[in-house]
Amino acid sequence: MGTPSYDIKNKGDDMQEEPKVKLHHEKGGDEKEKIIEKETPSQDINNKDTISSYVLRDDTQEIPKMEHEEGGYVKEKIVEKETISQYIIKIEGDDDAQEKLKVEYEEEEYEKEKIVEKETPSQDINNKGDDAQEKPKVEHEEGDDKETPSQDIIKMEGEGALEITKVVCEKIIVREDLAVQSKPPSKRDPPKMQTDNNKL
C-alpha cells in the first residue's frame, strides 16, 4: 500500500516538472521581448547617424557664407568709387579746377582701394566668419572717421591732424597742473582759520 503512494507522489513530481518546463518557455518569451528592446535602441543609433548628417549640412552652409561675405566687400568698394565720382561732378564748376581736382581725386581713389584690400584679408584671417561681417560694417560707418581718414589726413592734410593732437595734450597738462596746485593750499588754509578762531 505504501509503494503505490510513493508512486503517486512521484507522479505528482512529474506533474510539477511539466509546469516548470512551461515556465521556462514563458521566460524564454520574456527573453525575446528583451531582444526586441535591444533592437529598438539600435534604431536610435541610426537616428544619431542622421543627426550627424545634419551637422555636415550645417558645415556646407557656412562655406558659401564666406563667399557671400567676400562679395559684400567688393560691393562696398564700388560704392566708395561712386560717392567720390559724385563729389567730382559737384566740383566741376570751373574749367581750371576740373583738371587739378580730377588728378587729386584719382590718386585718392587708388589709395583707398589699396587700403581696403589690405584690411579685408587681415580680418578674414583672424575672424573668418560672422565676426568679419560685423566689424567692417562698423568701421565703414564710424571707423572711417578714425582710421582711414587719419591716414588720408596725414598724406593730404597732415597739419590739421597734428594740431588736433597738440590741443588734446595741452588740455591734459593744464588739468594736471591745476590739480597739483589746488591740493597744497587747501591743506594749509584750514589750520590758519582754526588758529584765528582760537585767538578770538
UniProtKB/Swiss-Prot annotation:
<feature type="compositionally biased region" description="Basic and acidic residues">
    <location>
        <begin position="146"/>
        <end position="158"/>
    </location>
</feature>
<feature type="propeptide">
    <location>
        <begin position="1"/>
        <end position="178"/>
    </location>
</feature>
<keyword id="KW-0372">Hormone</keyword>
<feature type="repeat" description="4">
    <location>
        <begin position="117"/>
        <end position="125"/>
    </location>
</feature>
<comment type="function">
    <text>Activates a lipid-based signal transduction pathway in which linolenic acid is converted to jasmonic acid, a potent activator of defense gene transcription, including proteinase inhibitor.</text>
</comment>
<keyword id="KW-0963">Cytoplasm</keyword>
<feature type="repeat" description="1; truncated">
    <location>
        <begin position="3"/>
        <end position="8"/>
    </location>
</feature>
<feature type="repeat" description="3">
    <location>
        <begin position="80"/>
        <end position="88"/>
    </location>
</feature>
<feature type="region of interest" description="Disordered">
    <location>
        <begin position="178"/>
        <end position="200"/>
    </location>
</feature>
<feature type="compositionally biased region" description="Basic and acidic residues">
    <location>
        <begin position="111"/>
        <end position="140"/>
    </location>
</feature>
<feature type="propeptide">
    <location>
        <begin position="197"/>
        <end position="200"/>
    </location>
</feature>
<dbReference type="GO" id="GO:0005179">
    <property type="term" value="F:hormone activity"/>
</dbReference>
<feature type="region of interest" description="Disordered">
    <location>
        <begin position="106"/>
        <end position="159"/>
    </location>
</feature>
<feature type="region of interest" description="Disordered">
    <location>
        <begin position="1"/>
        <end position="33"/>
    </location>
</feature>
<dbReference type="Pfam" id="PF07376">
    <property type="entry name" value="Prosystemin"/>
</dbReference>
<protein>
    <recommendedName>
        <fullName>Systemin</fullName>
    </recommendedName>
</protein>
<keyword id="KW-0677">Repeat</keyword>
<dbReference type="InterPro" id="IPR009966">
    <property type="entry name" value="Prosystemin/Systemin"/>
</dbReference>
<feature type="repeat" description="5">
    <location>
        <begin position="145"/>
        <end position="153"/>
    </location>
</feature>
<feature type="compositionally biased region" description="Basic and acidic residues">
    <location>
        <begin position="8"/>
        <end position="33"/>
    </location>
</feature>
<dbReference type="GO" id="GO:0005737">
    <property type="term" value="C:cytoplasm"/>
</dbReference>
<feature type="repeat" description="2">
    <location>
        <begin position="37"/>
        <end position="45"/>
    </location>
</feature>
